[in-house]
Amino acid sequence: MKTYNSTATRENEPHWSALQEVQLSYRNKIKATQRPKINMAEDALALFRSVWNEDEMELVESFKMLLMNNANRVLGVYHGSTGGTAGTIVDIRILLTVALKSNACKIIVAHNHPSGNLTPSPADLKITERLKEAAKLMDITLLDHLIITTNSYQSFANEGLI
Protein backbone atom coordinates (compact mmCIF):
# COMPACT_ATOMS: atom_id res chain seq x y z
CA MET A 1 0.00 0.00 0.00
CA LYS A 2 1.33 3.44 -0.95
CA THR A 3 1.68 5.90 1.92
CA TYR A 4 1.52 9.67 1.64
CA ASN A 5 4.55 10.04 3.86
CA SER A 6 7.56 7.83 3.19
CA THR A 7 8.54 7.90 6.89
CA ALA A 8 5.10 6.83 8.15
CA THR A 9 4.86 3.75 10.35
CA ARG A 10 1.99 2.17 12.26
CA GLU A 11 3.30 3.28 15.63
CA ASN A 12 3.23 7.01 14.74
CA GLU A 13 -0.30 7.02 13.33
CA PRO A 14 -2.53 9.71 14.85
CA HIS A 15 -5.14 8.96 17.46
CA TRP A 16 -8.28 9.83 15.51
CA SER A 17 -10.30 10.54 18.65
CA ALA A 18 -7.93 13.43 19.46
CA LEU A 19 -8.65 15.28 16.22
CA GLN A 20 -11.00 18.25 16.29
CA GLU A 21 -13.79 18.84 13.80
CA VAL A 22 -13.45 22.04 11.78
CA GLN A 23 -16.41 24.37 12.22
CA LEU A 24 -17.10 27.52 10.21
CA SER A 25 -18.88 30.54 11.63
CA TYR A 26 -19.40 34.10 10.48
CA ARG A 27 -21.04 36.93 12.39
CA ASN A 28 -21.98 40.28 10.92
CA LYS A 29 -23.96 42.66 13.12
CA ILE A 30 -25.04 44.91 10.25
CA LYS A 31 -28.12 43.95 8.23
CA ALA A 32 -27.46 43.29 4.54
CA THR A 33 -29.67 46.18 3.44
CA GLN A 34 -27.68 48.61 5.62
CA ARG A 35 -24.30 47.70 4.17
CA PRO A 36 -22.73 49.92 1.49
CA LYS A 37 -23.42 48.84 -2.09
CA ILE A 38 -20.66 48.91 -4.70
CA ASN A 39 -21.97 49.82 -8.16
CA MET A 40 -18.81 51.05 -9.89
CA ALA A 41 -15.07 51.44 -9.47
CA GLU A 42 -15.49 54.88 -7.89
CA ASP A 43 -17.60 53.35 -5.09
CA ALA A 44 -14.89 50.78 -4.38
CA LEU A 45 -12.22 53.49 -4.52
CA ALA A 46 -14.08 55.61 -1.94
CA LEU A 47 -14.40 52.65 0.40
CA PHE A 48 -10.75 51.62 0.00
CA ARG A 49 -9.60 55.22 0.61
CA SER A 50 -11.69 55.34 3.80
CA VAL A 51 -9.72 52.43 5.29
CA TRP A 52 -6.28 53.14 3.77
CA ASN A 53 -3.57 54.76 5.88
CA GLU A 54 -2.95 57.86 3.74
CA ASP A 55 0.33 58.50 5.60
CA GLU A 56 1.72 55.30 4.04
CA MET A 57 0.30 55.74 0.52
CA GLU A 58 3.60 57.09 -0.88
CA LEU A 59 5.78 55.11 1.52
CA VAL A 60 4.97 51.39 1.26
CA GLU A 61 2.86 49.18 -0.98
CA SER A 62 -0.21 47.56 0.58
CA PHE A 63 -2.82 45.12 -0.75
CA LYS A 64 -6.46 45.00 0.35
CA MET A 65 -9.57 43.03 -0.61
CA LEU A 66 -13.19 44.16 -0.58
CA LEU A 67 -15.64 41.33 0.15
CA MET A 68 -19.20 41.50 -1.18
CA ASN A 69 -22.34 39.40 -1.28
CA ASN A 70 -24.22 38.58 -4.48
CA ALA A 71 -26.04 41.94 -4.37
CA ASN A 72 -22.71 43.85 -4.23
CA ARG A 73 -23.29 44.72 -0.57
CA VAL A 74 -20.05 45.04 1.39
CA LEU A 75 -19.30 42.27 3.86
CA GLY A 76 -15.94 43.68 4.90
CA VAL A 77 -12.46 44.77 3.89
CA TYR A 78 -9.42 42.57 4.44
CA HIS A 79 -5.89 43.95 4.71
CA GLY A 80 -3.88 41.36 2.79
CA SER A 81 -0.35 42.64 3.17
CA THR A 82 2.07 45.52 3.50
CA GLY A 83 5.42 45.35 1.74
CA GLY A 84 8.19 47.70 0.78
CA THR A 85 8.51 50.62 -1.60
CA ALA A 86 8.36 48.50 -4.75
CA GLY A 87 6.13 45.54 -3.93
CA THR A 88 4.18 43.40 -1.49
CA ILE A 89 3.37 39.71 -1.15
CA VAL A 90 -0.07 38.52 -2.27
CA ASP A 91 -1.05 35.06 -0.97
CA ILE A 92 -3.98 33.83 -3.05
CA ARG A 93 -4.72 30.95 -0.66
CA ILE A 94 -5.16 33.34 2.25
CA LEU A 95 -7.27 35.75 0.19
CA LEU A 96 -9.60 32.93 -0.84
CA THR A 97 -9.73 31.57 2.71
CA VAL A 98 -10.93 34.98 3.88
CA ALA A 99 -13.43 35.24 1.00
CA LEU A 100 -14.85 31.79 1.70
CA LYS A 101 -15.00 32.35 5.46
CA SER A 102 -16.96 35.59 4.93
CA ASN A 103 -19.23 33.86 2.37
CA ALA A 104 -18.29 36.44 -0.27
CA CYS A 105 -19.63 35.92 -3.79
CA LYS A 106 -17.67 38.82 -5.28
CA ILE A 107 -14.38 40.52 -4.50
CA ILE A 108 -12.50 43.62 -5.56
CA VAL A 109 -8.81 43.95 -4.76
CA ALA A 110 -6.65 47.05 -4.60
CA HIS A 111 -3.07 47.98 -4.01
CA ASN A 112 -1.18 51.24 -4.05
CA HIS A 113 1.89 52.25 -6.03
CA PRO A 114 4.07 54.49 -3.82
CA SER A 115 5.80 55.71 -7.00
CA GLY A 116 2.55 57.28 -8.20
CA ASN A 117 2.72 55.25 -11.43
CA LEU A 118 -0.71 53.91 -12.41
CA THR A 119 0.58 51.46 -15.02
CA PRO A 120 0.14 47.82 -13.91
CA SER A 121 3.39 45.89 -13.70
CA PRO A 122 3.72 42.43 -15.27
CA ALA A 123 3.48 41.04 -11.70
CA ASP A 124 0.23 43.00 -11.15
CA LEU A 125 -1.27 41.52 -14.32
CA LYS A 126 -0.12 38.00 -13.44
CA ILE A 127 -1.45 37.98 -9.87
CA THR A 128 -4.76 39.41 -11.07
CA GLU A 129 -5.18 36.63 -13.62
CA ARG A 130 -4.17 33.94 -11.10
CA LEU A 131 -6.56 35.31 -8.47
CA LYS A 132 -9.39 35.57 -11.01
CA GLU A 133 -8.95 31.93 -12.09
CA ALA A 134 -8.55 30.60 -8.53
CA ALA A 135 -11.60 32.54 -7.30
CA LYS A 136 -13.63 31.26 -10.25
CA LEU A 137 -13.04 27.68 -9.03
CA MET A 138 -14.76 28.69 -5.79
CA ASP A 139 -17.65 30.47 -7.56
CA ILE A 140 -16.27 33.83 -6.46
CA THR A 141 -16.10 36.61 -9.03
CA LEU A 142 -13.15 39.01 -9.11
CA LEU A 143 -14.89 42.18 -10.29
CA ASP A 144 -11.95 44.56 -10.37
CA HIS A 145 -8.40 45.34 -9.31
CA LEU A 146 -7.60 48.95 -8.51
CA ILE A 147 -4.19 50.57 -8.44
CA ILE A 148 -4.41 53.55 -6.11
CA THR A 149 -2.14 56.59 -5.74
CA THR A 150 -2.61 59.70 -3.62
CA ASN A 151 -4.18 61.61 -6.52
CA SER A 152 -5.67 59.02 -8.83
CA TYR A 153 -6.43 55.38 -9.53
CA GLN A 154 -6.71 52.86 -12.34
CA SER A 155 -9.40 50.20 -12.65
CA PHE A 156 -8.42 46.97 -14.42
CA ALA A 157 -12.11 46.44 -15.27
CA ASN A 158 -12.50 49.92 -16.79
CA GLU A 159 -9.33 49.33 -18.84
CA GLY A 160 -10.50 45.91 -20.08
CA LEU A 161 -7.75 44.09 -18.17
CA ILE A 162 -10.18 41.78 -16.32
Per-segment meaning from a language model:
Residues 34-94, 98:
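Glycine-rich, small/polar surface segments that engage phosphate groups of diverse ligands
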Residues 2-28, 46, 71, 81, ...:
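Active-site-proximal loop/helix of nucleotide/amide-processing enzymes and allied scaffolds
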